[in-house]
Design a protein with these regions (language model features):
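Walker A/P-loop NTP-binding motif
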Residues: 65-80
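Walker A (P-loop) phosphate-binding loop of P-loop NTPases
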Residues: 61-62
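Conserved Walker A/P-loop ATP-binding site and its immediately adjacent core
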Residues: 82-102
Length: 297
């Protein structure tokens, strides 16, 4: 239900809302004469009429969480009655991290707590104009492998935070739930925003590999952003990443390397394992093989 009391939006905020609707994002992406070009690019994709799914990330500290929070905040302010979600592998990670970022974003752009209310009992943020953001627990549950608990909820769009922690089933279900709430009335394309660090899971197979091959469908977009491309980051943080002794962590978070190997002693690569189910040689010859470590049984 929308909040019934009449609330006046401060003039300074009203100007920002209008700028956002017009696609002018400098008040977000520019600071001290420097512009976060990748963040600008992400916001343009998130507000265009061409793309549906955006995977943004590829390394640590690319302003991914800030971008997600500011996008949802201003979409709610710009489009009364719209309905969105933020989903993470565990709800407590939203309340302990993502929600804190959301509050910082509100403070940064002059959105005080008279304009929205957080309901901690039912886990949603409701705005004065009837817009709403649901906070979703995307943890995999054996009793609900298809995420049917979200199968009948309708959203305008949404954001999956830290996609590397999230099960494919959550992504596969939620992308069918967007574009279902006032999109036609508000003139909005359905949008699913996914932020991440490199991880060899469904993001690697669904976004990164097809993009690398030039085969990513036109409605999908992968936007890589390395830590060095964030002009607002403390240089000392980058130096800290460079000194880590964990090679995999350094490759993922500093270099944005998706091709890293979790286990250098692995007998089979990730790609080889994924190709088991569509191996052209087995299809051609009709011969299949299976191996087993019998000593373990």
């Amino acid at each position: 239900m929308a909040r019934s009391k009449v609330t006046d939006v401060p003039m300074a905020l009203a100007v920002k809302i209008e700028l956002f609707k017009r696609g002018c994002f400098d008040f977000i992406t520019v600071k001290d004469g420097l512009k976060h070009e990748k963040q600008e690019h992400a916001l343009k994709i998130l507000t265009d009429n061409e793309h549906v799914e955006l995977l943004y990330g590829g390394a640590a500290v690319g302003a991914k969480s800030w971008t997600g929070a500011v996008w949802l905040l201003f979409m709610c302010l710009c489009y009364p009655g719209s309905k969105w979600f933020i989903g993470r592998a565990e709800l407590k990670r939203i309340t302990q991290s993502t929600l804190i970022t959301f509050y910082k974003v509100c403070n940064q752009y002059g959105v005080d707590d008279t304009l929205y209310k957080y309901n901690g009992q039912y886990n949603y943020i409701e705005f004065f104009n009837g817009s709403r953001i649901d906070l979703l627990d995307l943890q995999y549950k054996p009793g609900d492998p298809l995420y049917e608990r979200y199968g009948s909820i309708e959203y305008t769009g949404g954001w999956i935070e830290e996609g590397g922690e999230v099960n494919f089933g959550a992504y596969d279900t939620l992308k069918t739930r967007i574009g279902r709430h006032l999109n036609n009335e508000l003139g909005l394309r359905r949008k699913l925003f996914i932020t991440c660090n490199p991880k060899k899971n469904w993001m690697y197979d669904t976004f990164y590999k097809p993009d690398k091959k030039g085969e990513l469908p036109e409605y999908m977009y992968y936007l890589a952003c390395l830590v060095q491309e964030n002009p607002f980051i403390d240089p000392d943080y980058i130096e800290g990443l460079k000194t880590t002794k964990d090679k995999v962590k350094r490759e993922r978070l500093l270099k944005g390397n998706w091709e890293y190997d979790d286990n250098p002693n692995a007998l089979c690569s990730h790609d080889a394992i994924c190709e088991i189910f569509g191996n052209k040689i087995s299809i051609k010859t009709g011969t299949n093989y299976i191996t087993g470590d019998i000593a373990r049984f």
